[in-house]
Amino acid sequence: MLIGAVADIHGNFDALTAAIERHPDVPLWICVGDVASRTGAYPEPSRPLYWIKGNNENFDRIAAWEAGEPQPRNLHLIRNGTAAAVGPLRVAGLGGTFAPTWFETRAADLPAGKASRSRLRQGYGGQEGAPDVSPDDEKRDDKRRHFVREEVEACKGLGPVDILLTHEAARPFILVDEPRPGAKPRRRDAGKPAISDVLAALKPRLHLCGHHHRFIETIRDGVPSVCIDRINRSYLLIDASTLAYRRMDQ
């Protein structure tokens, strides 16, 4: 049995559909976050898609789904600090990004963006007087895009899991930015210690992350750790028995 793994859809539902339809023998798919379009829309894939949140999502809709409202067809959100059965595999999730100023906040206390709070009062739609805020500005303002310590600790206590899904990468995760005229390429460690802590505690058979829009393979304390590129470029097919994976170009 094969399972598909994708990352950073960002509303490119055509690319997601193309990947799924290319492999009719793959019954289940997983995603490491950033599913929504810029307008906050979500897909209805033809196969079940188990996903964690990224930092670019419709957080009002996620809050509603976490409160019990039904998700679109075949979408299955794995909440932070929980695990789900994906076929024969136990898959844990820690979505969103790290922000030191919000890390000690309770997840329930992370504030919504200003535009989100306004829409909660007014209802959805283009009502006159709605705030003139771009979708990107709103997402940056919405602190629900982050994970917090209580969710990290919940993840660490989940016990044996086969696959850990995170949006952020573990540390070290060295990136070299594209060179600019007159400037040296900037080399930085974009990994997060909190993700490393979860990896060390859980020791999953496989770790998958995204966020950085590139394909990078590493081994961390014996655990294969793969950053999946965004869906318009590639995705993974994973053997559910061995967790051996293949990168598939779009």
Positions of predicted regions on the chain:
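Core catalytic region of metal-dependent phosphoesterases/phosphodiesterases
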Residues: 2, 6-86, 189, 228
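Active-site-proximal loop/helix segment associated with metal-binding centers of metalloenzymes
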Residues: 89-186
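Binuclear metal-dependent phosphoesterase catalytic core
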Residues: 62-64, 84-87, 196-201, 213-250
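A short helix->loop->beta-strand "cap" motif at the edges of active sites that frequently abuts
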Residues: 45-48, 202-205, 223-224
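Proline-aspartate-enriched helix->loop->beta-strand connector
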Residues: 161-170, 195, 199-209
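Catalytic metal-binding/acid-base residues of hydrolase active sites
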Residues: 10, 35-36, 55-57, 83, ...
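Active-site-proximal beta-strand elements of phosphoester/diester hydrolases
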Residues: 2-10, 88-97, 163-167, 224-229
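Catalytic-core regions built around general acid/base machinery
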Residues: 41-46, 193-201
